[in-house]
A protein has these predicted regions:
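Conserved N-proximal alpha/beta basic substrate-recognition cap immediately N-terminal to
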Residues: 3-113, 127-128
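Glycine-rich phosphate-binding loop of ATP-grasp-fold ATP-dependent ligases
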Residues: 100-104, 119-146, 172, 195-214
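ATP-grasp fold ATP-binding core
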Residues: 105, 114-137, 151-167, 248, ...
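Phosphate-binding site of ATP-dependent enzymes
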Residues: 118, 143-200, 251-265, 273
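A short catalytic or substrate-binding loop motif that flags glycine-/basic-rich loops and adjacent residues
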Residues: 126-127, 165-169, 240-244, 334-337
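A long amphipathic alpha-helix within ATP-dependent nucleotide-binding catalytic cores
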Residues: 154-156, 163, 185, 198-260, ...
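ATP-dependent carboxylate/phosphate-activation module, predominantly the ATP-grasp catalytic core
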Residues: 175-232, 269-296
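Peripheral (often C-terminal) accessory segments that flank ATP-dependent C-N-forming ligase machineries
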Residues: 286-349
């Protein structure tokens, strides 16, 4: 860290979550040894940021696929890779339907042609969490949108274009690929997004409860078939190329006839993500208790701090036998200068 977190905040969160975290400043980190480095996610910028610490890691990490960055690795993080996995999923489970597979477009003319047929969603190849996404109604692409798309095509080379689906539920399957490239299923994630696909929050609940929410639309058997096939596809595609956490975003949608369908590979996030955070948080809740994890942002000085203080008063944290029963807790320290806070609401909000 660049600055040590507030001591009282760290101590109070250690009491709630039983964690013994020891943040270190950049200066001290240069003097320490590490078994490995596990940032939120890897990118050229993060590799450069941590370059001086790599030599202080053990040999196993220094020789691993995650220790260096190359242009070949860049495509692993693209929407093209998600489309590749989705295509294999549809081939294995034909009832998913080919019309959910995105098209790769290299020119504005190709995008216009698809726009004339139906409502579309256009996505930049390297973007996530609702960023770099344009929703274009059938035949109504604007000059401003064409300008934005031209910029993306110029900088990134292509875009992915898909049919706009009537979204009913956003969810994900969370995994970890170990050093031997075995894929381990961690659990489900049910999350909320804005109309434009930007992340808003996660439901924090037991895995069986989350599976039940999703299975209302898919049936438990079909949902597990999706998971089994996804594990095969992801293992094959990323074997020998990636180690760490990853999440596959999915969607339940309603088609023109009122039937529910599933898009089983909207996006692949090769990093920690909010779903994995939510799975970790659930372990601290009493059995059968559920909550909501979200990120609250405000550009106004003092507003975040005021909101946190209000929530603490309105929803006091209640714990029994070391587990959270109800209430509110901010998961990041706040001050008057804070612009965001990660927070957890437990029980009835």
């Amino acid at each position: 860290v660049t600055k040590m977190p507030d001591f009282d905040f760290m101590k109070s969160r250690e009491e709630v979550f039983g964690l013994d975290c020891k943040p270190v400043t950049w200066e001290k980190a240069q003097l320490l040894s590490f078994s490995e480095l596990k940032p939120w996610g890897w990118s050229p910028r993060v590799h450069n940021l941590l370059k001086d610490l790599k030599s202080r890691c053990n040999e196993q990490f220094r020789e691993s696929v995650m220790s260096t960055w190359s242009d070949e690795r860049k495509d692993l993080y693209s929407r093209r890779m998600a489309a590749t996995c989705l295509t294999e999923m549809v081939q294995a489970i034909p009832c998913l339907g080919k019309d959910i597979i995105p098209s790769e477009c290299n020119t504005l003319a190709e995008i216009r042609l698809l726009s004339e047929k139906e409502n579309i969603v256009v996505k930049a190849p390297w973007s996530s969490s609702g960023k770099g996404v344009l929703f274009i109604p059938k035949g109504e692409i604007t000059c401003k949108e064409e300008e934005v798309l031209s910029g993306i095509l110029r900088k990134q080379g292509y875009v992915m274009v898909e049919k706009r689906l009537n979204r009913v539920l956003d969810f994900a399957m969370e995994f970890e690929m170990d050093r031997l490239f075995h894929l381990n299923f961690l659990g489900y994630s049910v999350f909320q997004t804005s109309r434009r696909g930007e992340y808003e929050g996660n439901t924090v609940a037991s895995n069986s409860s989350l599976e039940g929410i999703i299975a209302k639309y898919t049936g438990t058997g079909f949902l597990r078939e999706i998971r089994e096939q996804l594990e095969k596809v992801v293992t094959t595609v990323f074997h020998g190329k990636y180690v760490g956490y990853l999440g596959v975003d999915m969607m339940i949608y309603e088609d023109e006839s009122g039937e529910f369908g599933i898009q089983p590979c909207v996006e692949i996030n090769l990093r920690y993500n909010m779903g994995i955070v939510s799975i970790a948080l659930q372990r601290y809740l009493r059995e059968s208790v559920e909550g909501v994890f979200n990120i609250h942002f405000s550009p106004k000085p003092g507003e975040i701090m005021q909101s946190v203080e209000k929530n603490r008063d309105m929803y006091p944290l209640l714990m029994e036998a070391g587990q959270i029963v109800s209430g509110y807790i901010n998961l990041t320290p706040v001050s008057r200068e804070s612009r965001f806070v990660a927070e957890l609401y437990i029980g009835n909000k």
